[in-house]
A protein has these predicted regions:
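Acidic anion/phosphate-binding donor-loop and adjacent secondary structure
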Residues: 138, 142-157
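Short His-centered aromatic/hydrophobic patch
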Residues: 60-63, 81-87, 105
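N-terminal strand-loop element at the rim of the active site
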Residues: 5-65, 70, 193
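Conserved donor-binding/catalytic core segment of Leloir-type glycosyltransferases
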Residues: 4, 151-169, 173-186
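A short, basic/aromatic alpha-helical/loop segment that forms part
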Residues: 12-16, 145-146, 162-171, 181, ...
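A conserved, positively charged/aromatic
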Residues: 95-130
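Nucleotide-activated donor-binding/catalytic signature segment of Leloir-type glycosyltransferases, i.e.
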Residues: 197-204
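Glycosyltransferase donor-sugar binding loop
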Residues: 35-41, 162, 184-197
């Protein structure tokens, strides 16, 4: 079976790492290809068959046609889109070529219209797919971290929070809210907010 994963992002974060790990496992049983944005292609497993495209908007007809031709050349049985924008683009591509479309929702979405045009939707929790009017399946997220070996953890009893250290994730609110909780909190992740969060922890 030929499976094609498509990710069109500007940064290599949670979704992208998920796809990289998923494809790396799937390649042992299926023919796996990836199409990813040119600015993140270097982050993916070098042993994967990865094609790069310029990240473009969902209204760029020229780039959608180019993507359609690339997909047609790969000739996948299944196209697996990740993220709302990518799913919307694949919904258009389906007018130009034929394949089964699987899409993964990586978080709670208010507008599910794009996902309901897929043949199957995978959600990371039952809550994510609860309101979908299309065949769906829950596959929980896994975690396969690459630790750098540095750790300040001095106890076996702690609360753990893992994620991308960006403002949108709200780790600053978590740290502030943890001030009066009598338990250790460990945060694992990387991102632009690392220094600010480290400073916030010391100040508290």
């Amino acid at each position: 079976m030929n499976v094609l994963h498509i990710v069109m992002s500007n940064s290599f974060a949670g979704i992208e790492q998920h796809v990289n790990e998923l494809a790396s496992v799937q390649k042992n049983k299926s023919n796996i290809s990836l199409i990813v944005s040119s600015n993140i292609i270097g982050k993916f497993d070098k042993h994967l068959d990865t094609k790069e495209v310029k990240n473009f908007g969902r209204r760029s007809i020229y780039n959608i046609v180019k993507l359609s031709l690339l997909i047609k050349n790969i000739n996948p049985d299944i196209v697996h889109s990740h993220g709302t924008k990518t799913t919307q683009i694949i919904n258009i591509v389906k007018y130009f070529t034929s394949f089964k479309h699987v899409s993964t929702i990586h978080g709670i979405k208010k507008n599910l219209n794009a996902y309901e045009k897929a043949d199957l939707v995978i959600g990371v929790s039952s809550k994510v797919v609860a309101n979908l009017n299309v065949q769906s399946k829950v596959v929980s997220n896994w975690w396969s971290p690459m630790m750098n070996g540095n750790s300040d953890i001095k106890t076996n009893e702690y609360a753990l929070s893992v994620g991308r250290l960006e403002k949108v994730k709200g780790f600053d609110l978590l740290i502030k809210g943890w001030r009066n909780i009598n338990s250790n909190l460990v945060i694992i992740g990387s991102g632009k907010e690392y220094k600010e969060l480290k400073s916030l922890i010391y100040n508290y």
